[in-house]
Amino acid sequence: MTKLAGLLAAIFLAWGQPAFADEFQNLQCGTDIPKALIGKRSSNGPIVETEKKYRALGLKGLGGDEISDQLSSVNWLICGAEYVELIDRRGLVRDALLFPPHSKTAPAFSGICQAKGRDLPDIILAVLDGSTAADPLPVKTAWKIDQKGAKFVPVSGEGLTCPRGGIITLDGGR
């Protein structure tokens, strides 16, 4: 009986670590962070605890959005840069993106944009040109969220405009 208990304990210790691993375990600054995140299980604990656990990465939770019943996006500051993860309902990181720097004059956006005056069917993640007081604002860089494939897909910003209401930069892009 003791041998069986010892064997079970050894199996648990050998396999238990991967079961509790999250997307930040084994992550290192200076590596291909999106590639390292994809396919990993998302951390599911309190953000404060995750930030503390991975302090060496400069980890900071920046918020998230529910894209659909099947998919969420979560923004993290990792190693001094912002990354966005697409996480499925099972908690797997399906895609990750290094998000460009954004500011008051180049605000971050998430939502529905227009091309030629018509709403696009996909949710767009973008950096906008906030140098004017116009609404909607033109797009500098953008990705659509392919909900079926759970991927970020680059899209041309040419002729694309997005309303100020979807700006997610803290200062609102004003």
Predicted regions and their residues:
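Bacterial N-terminal signal peptides that target proteins for export
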Residues: 1-7
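Cleavable N-terminal signal peptides
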Residues: 8-9, 19
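Sec/Tat signal peptide C-region and signal peptidase I cleavage site
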Residues: 15-21
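Exposed acidic/polar residues on beta-strands and adjacent loops within beta-sheet cores, strongest
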Residues: 21-174
